């Protein structure tokens, strides 16, 4: 009986520690800050802020449909290309009143998290990892929102 109670107590403690890691407000704020550096950096054309958010090996990917053939196509961009597009001001084309940046942490465990950003014309799903003490975006899967019917 003592063994069973001890096992239950240990299981509860381990589970509680895992829940504490998932719910840690400090880590959640750090993850959110990384996501905001990414999206706000994009809108502002702030390449330094964008670069701070990204791991150098980042892969940003999107599956789109070729309008001529109707077939899926794979689009890929690396960290430096994204930083350069930010520096070039591509994000500044979105007017300030349309610069949506709704950030939601979908899941987190230890040093990995998944974050959703609802932006003006697209949705980003970020895979974020703690790397040398800082949260960095490792992967982004994104998709354009459908255009409103006219």
Predicted segments — roles?
Residues 1-4:
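Positively charged n-region of N-terminal signal peptides that target proteins for export
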Residues 7-16:
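Bacterial N-terminal signal peptides
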Residues 18-48, 52, 56:
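Short, low-complexity N-terminal intrinsically disordered segments enriched in polar/charged residues
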Residues 43-84:
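N-terminal, post-signal-peptide region of Sec/Tat-exported proteins
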Residues 58, 78-79, 143-150:
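Ligand-binding grooves and catalytic loops that recognize ribose/phosphate and carbohydrate rings
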Residues 114, 123-148:
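Short beta-strand edge/turn micro-motifs at domain boundaries
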């Amino acid at each position: 009986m003592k063994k069973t109670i001890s096992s239950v107590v240990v299981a509860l403690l381990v589970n509680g520690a895992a829940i504490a890691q998932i719910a840690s407000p400090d880590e959640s704020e750090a993850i959110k800050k990384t996501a905001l550096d990414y999206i706000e950096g994009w809108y502002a054309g702030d390449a330094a802020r964008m670069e701070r958010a990204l791991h150098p090996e980042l892969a940003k990917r999107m599956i789109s449909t070729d309008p001529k053939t109707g077939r899926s196509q794979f689009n890929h961009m690396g960290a430096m290309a994204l930083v350069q597009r930010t520096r070039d001001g591509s994000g500044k084309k979105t007017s300030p009143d349309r610069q949506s940046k709704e950030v939601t942490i979908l899941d987190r465990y230890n040093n990995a998290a998944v974050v959703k950003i609802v932006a003006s014309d697209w949705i980003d799903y970020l895979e974020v990892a703690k790397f040398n003490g800082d949260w960095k975006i490792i992967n982004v899967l994104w998709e354009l929102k459908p255009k409103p019917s006219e």
